[in-house]
Amino acid sequence: MNLDRIEQQAGHLPAYQIADSVNEALMESANLVITAPPGAGKSTLLPLTILRGMSDQALEGFIHNHLKSQGKILMLEPRRLAARQIAERMAQILGEPVGKTIGYRVRFESKVSDDTRIEVLTEGILTRMLVNDATLEGVSCLIFDEFHERSINSDLALALARQTQEIIRPDLKLIIMSATIDASIICQALQAPLIESKSRMFPIETIYADHDIDRYQVAQEMAATICQAFRNQEDDILAFLPGQGEIMKCEELLRSALSSTEIYPLYGNLSPEKQRLAIAPSKPGERKIVLATPIAETSLTIEGVRIVVDSGLCRKLVYDARTGLSHLETVRISQDMATQRRGRAGRITSGVCYRLWTQTSEHLMPEQRLPEILDADLSSLVLDIAAFGENKPELLPWLTLPPKGNLVLAQQLLMSLNALTPDHDTHALSGSITAEGSRMAQLPCHPRIAKMMISSDSPSIQALACDIAALLEEKDPMGENEDSDMTLRLSLLRSARCKKNLGRWNRIAQIAQEYRKMLRIKEDNAPIDAEEVGHLIALAYPERIAHATDHAGNFKMSNGNTIFIDPCDSMAANEWLAIASLNLASTSSSSSGQGRKGRVFLSAPVNWKNLPAQTCENISWDSKALAVKMQQETRIGALIIDSKPIQNANRETVSNIICEAARKDGLSMFDWNESVHRLQQRVAQVAEWHPELEIPDLSTEHLLPTARAWLPFYLEEGGKMKTSVTELKKLNLCEILWNILPYDLQQEIDHLAPTHIRVPSGSNIRIDYRLGAEAPVLSVRLQECFGMTSTPTVDAGRQPLLLELLSPGFKPVQLTQDLASFWQGTYFEVRKELKRRYPKHFWPENPLESQAVRGVKR
């Protein structure tokens, strides 16, 4: 290990100017934050200078004595390509091959040895190391490079590392490095000093478009701008596009326009060999164009690039908590991402950056990208935390706390997969890992896929699960427009393996092989049982078991959503399917099938008899039948396989369901007749007059939400429950409401607000209590009041009634609360008119001395 070469080979890099400051800071602080612009050399240089400081024992107390000669530095990189290139560059500086002093570990690939002192890792590798050994024995320092990307794995790895540092390894050093991060927040959280590299990048000219890029014409607009840049500028071009599809379309257009120019795609699914070709220097005298996803944003140096063309778009994986599906969305990049991309043009010399958006719209872009942990599927994260030994994820020292709702969903999924078992503590998010969960956590894949791979002890079924897992992880080699038959793809994969002619199946075959190594099983290319494929998929995605609802391609899934499969698809003819991959747009809460634009991509037939079904009672309110539905059902999730009526359902359950239905739709469930409304008005009137009586609220607005307090007592009669609206409408609601009141209040209300009053004619006339009116109303024919000297009252004489005096034809002729004054004055005018209209009736000149009558009297 020749560390003297560091200054010779990399001393010119701007980051070398802060190397001593970094080592000095690590003597005083456990944590450190470093910022440096793109191209400063922080990723390739600083790990080496820290290692040199350790080897020279320049950092007194940096590590425990027993680690001084063997403590490793682990540096995390977000992407595999960057990890490989950085390791190769550091090894080159030392004049050594990769795998000696400098090594790397990425998924399914590693180059390390017993002599390795610096390991460049992708983030999932560190998480696995922490889970397997929380002490990180033999490790002195962790470096989180390009931390501004805030991937879910980097946030998790940092949280676990901080927990280790706080509880077990106070000597462990944590370093955060980035070019575009808000360092103040990180420094405060980690109580870490900040060291900034003030070096300047080479000048970069920025050219903005006159309009924002059309998302439906990304390849076309990018190709046009690349051609413009190729004609107007010199040197190589690095173009950023959102995804592989746009790259392939743009490449096709450019090969027609610039046929003599080397064009290289660069994205994650490419083989390492093709990725190395893309980042290698162009041939002398030739120019090249690299079409890349955000994989080339950070850490990578592509020699010869002086021109950047930026679409301003990227793919973002978004988790939909409603459906449990994650899907890719094409979104605008943030300003810090734009800065990173622009910086690719000024790493070696001055450059030019073409931006396919206007300068005005740039101000609308968010300054920083959101941490992935805020809208990601947290299932793997929660399982890793449980395997680490922490049952309550929210207690870890997070920089950004994961959303509680997504944590709950993740734990529910893991419990359904038997990876976690609930703790007794119901007041916090908690779940202990099971033996099966521990096995799942050892596999570098989503818990769903891990569940599928460990579900059987049969080597042939495990081998089949490995093939399925590999197919699900990689882009479908047959394309999305082909038949959705998963078994067909598996057969083609196995056939290609047998013929040693993998071609487009090569990457999938490699992943399947790595999984088989982990499970210690051999390759199996035997014929495939399609229903076994479906059964394995159902283990991974139990909520995506689907049952045909018609013969037109409509299916209902066990999570309640509906999907559509093209009737021409071979899988559409099956009654039962297990869905491995689907377009989010194809899910719907409607069974009509209208408006669906997506479809199922991968599926397999499944025998429902081999799936775990549950027998349960379904007691619910049927809004169509307007009655309680009482069935014993055999179910797979929302799919009903068998249903039988229940004769003697639990009475309390039935009662609660009716009360809940009443809360939502009680106005139409009971007979709210005029008598009920009059009672409610009368009771409310007394409550208004006498609040000291504390009369219960009998208003409909109060009764329906509180139905559980008064309704259950009347739902059973003769040992039989009333379960339908027809039966409920027969309830005497007036009697029920009156009985809500204690007996003493009933007596008081009858005294203060009688329902009727006797008038001189002998008739009992009903009093109309109208809450909010001037006074209760007594509507009575004028002739029946002859001889009544004063206005009748209620409320123990405190409230005169409002008399609505009527003609013999029951038409109002006068309103008054002063009957005595009426007899002395207005009566004579009214008498004249009534005498003319009703000549057969008796209209005396002295009504106070006349006998009240009900009908005609002369």
Model-derived segments and spans:
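Short, solvent-exposed loop/turn motifs
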Residues: 201, 562, 763-765
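Short, solvent-exposed cationic patches
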Residues: 343, 578-604, 779-802
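A positional "C-terminalness" feature that preferentially activates on distal terminal regions of long
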Residues: 537, 568, 628-858
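Short acidic-hydrophobic surface loop/beta-edge motif
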Residues: 194-197, 553-558, 753-760
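P-loop NTPase motor module signature
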Residues: 1-452, 524, 564, 583, ...
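Active-site lining segments that contact anionic ligands and/or coordinate catalytic metals
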Residues: 29, 351, 463-466, 532-534, ...
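Second RecA-like catalytic domain
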Residues: 44, 253, 259-260, 265, ...
